[in-house]
Amino acid sequence: MGVAVTVMCNDGTTANGYALKATNPSNKFLFVFHEWWGLNDYIKQTSEQLFKDLNSEVNIIAIDLYDGKVAAVRDSAKAYMSALSPERANVIIDGFLTHVGDSAQIATIGWCMGGGYSMQASLQLQQQALGCVMYYGMPESNTERLKTLQADVLMIWPNQDKWINKEVVDTFKANMVSLDKKLFVEEYNADHAFANPSNPKFDNEAATNANNKALIFLKSKFGIN
């Protein structure tokens, strides 16, 4: 359904992604950010489902932050995530921003590691950012950087998450309020990565509800019925 894409980055390197093109020409884009596993078949299938759920009206690009590497086991995933520098991620995101052009209106979504990069991308997109969905991802804690955010944020938070814990979320809420930024937090009685069917702690009911909330949020930002 989608196609592999390669774009040039401003440092002379290339970046990879998986793209689905809107049925009719559109400047609306959704940047999708993978979990620590990499841009695997699950993320591609999720991107395809998002494309359908957004009525094929939005261009979808699942961005590969690992430059082609995909992990099959946790040790590899941990190593790949640790090896990813914020600088390289910024270069990759900027490459795709240049690729879609100055007129593009872009929302972001991601899970786990990708949830954090969903927020970082929205910060990087500045006035082109439409909205940010972050599933159990680490929010930006630097208020000087956070004040530049121009997108509303939907945070999907499982309250059993030991990494993105209550302290992290409460601090993020307080920072967003102090900066007069819009944050919507959907809390679930679930654990980290509850939305991924391959996770032993997958919660189908919570995942379905969270997906519906994410779609309502994204459709409102894209102006889709």
Where in this protein do the model-derived segments appear?
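Alpha/beta-hydrolase fold nucleophile elbow
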Residues: 101-111
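Serine-hydrolase catalytic machinery in alpha/beta-hydrolase-like enzymes
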Residues: 3-101, 198
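Acidic catalytic loop of the alpha/beta-hydrolase fold
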Residues: 160-164
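Short alpha-helix in the alpha/beta-hydrolase fold that links the catalytic acid
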Residues: 45-46, 165-175
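A conserved short beta-strand
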Residues: 128-138
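C-terminal catalytic histidine-bearing segment of alpha/beta-hydrolase fold enzymes
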Residues: 179-225
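Short beta-strand/loop motif that positions the catalytic acidic residue
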Residues: 149, 155-157
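Gly/Ala-rich beta-loop-alpha elbow adjacent to hydrolase catalytic centers
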Residues: 110-114, 118
